[in-house]
Each structure stands twice: as structure tokens, then as C-alpha cells.
Amino acid sequence: MRFFKLGKKEFNWKYVLGEILLIFIGINLAIWFNNWNASKKAIADKKVAITKITEEVMNNNNQLDIAQEQNHQILLAYSEYKNKFDGNTSLLLATPAEVIELNSKYPGFYRVSDSTLLENGVYRYNGGTHILLEIPILNEIAWDTTKTLSILNEFDYECLYDLESMYSLQRLVQKEINKAADALQKRELKELMNILGFLNQLNRQLSQNYKTVLENIDNCDS
């Protein structure tokens, strides 16, 4: 009878280490590829966000300019008419020539229903003020959407600072606009004029902020 001796099988460390190395390389390649994809998507999202923010700011700026012009006219009209008001904004003490001049400068601001001759050619006019308050729609949809995309770290710090500062001031302006609309609804004209005067200052500042952001928005993509 012949006997065979089983030899001890050697463990192949080189093979095992090679497999481990391949797995390690594979994992790192997968991580790198995922990071590359995420970075590529973030850059693409950032470009879209900048485009949408630019469009939003331009539209808001146009809305603000229209409202600013209209509401500034209201302030001018009130400042000239208030010296002619007789106790309230329903009664006006003026000559026909003065009324014609005021109406030509500020059409529709005061509408006469009847008049009574007093003396020296002065009439007491009975009527009422009619104010068309321009309410701008100042959006921040693009900015809010950008903040939900987790791409703010892709933006330059100065760019982020300017954007947040601009939208913060815009919210303050919107709050004052709402106050103005409420004062008009309640026919609180003195309060309305105070608010519009304050808004006049805020609007100029916001308009400058819009201009600054639009001039520097391309730097956000650097």
C-alpha cells in the first residue's frame, strides 16, 4: 500500500494584498467619480441660479423704478395741495387759476364736485383726493430657491454678502409698501405721506444695491 503525504498549501499574500489594493482603488475611484459628478452638478446649478437671480433683480429694479416715479408724484402733489386744503383733504381754498394749474401738474389727484365763491376770487372747492398707489412686486423666488440647493458654498463671499444685503433691504422696502397700502386703505393720508417719504429714501438705497449686484453678479461665477 502506498501512502501520499499531503503538502501544506502556502497562503498567497501577494494575491490577497493585490485584491485589497484593487478594492481600495475601486472605492476611491467611485468616491472621486461621485464627487466629480456632484461638483459638476453644483457648478451647473450655480450658473442657472446666477442667471435666475440676475433676471429677478432686473425685474425687481424695473418694478421699483415705476413705483418710485409714481409715488414720488404723489408726494409732490400732496406737498402743493396741502397748503390749499381747508382743514381736511375734502375742502380746497383756491382760485380757479390755481386749481387749473394744480390739475394740469397732477391730473386726477383732487377731483372737484362743487364750489362756493368766497371773496377776492377765492373759492371753497368740495371734492376729494384720489391716490393711485403703485405697488411693486419685488420677488426673491430665485434667491430662496438658490438657498435650498446647497450651493451657497460655491459663491464668492463678497457676492453672497451683497446678495443677502440687497434682499434684506428689499424685505424692509416690501414691509413699508404694505404699511403704505394699509394707510391708504384707512384714508390716513398724513401717515401715508410719512411712509412714502421714508420709502423714497429706502427705494434710492435699494436701487443702488440692485445696480451694484448687477454690475458684480458675474464675479459670483468665478
Predicted regions: what they are:
Residues L17-W32:
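Hydrophobic membrane-insertion alpha-helices, especially the h-region
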Residues M1-K14, N35-S222:
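Long, hydrophobic alpha-helical segments that serve as membrane-spanning/inserting helices
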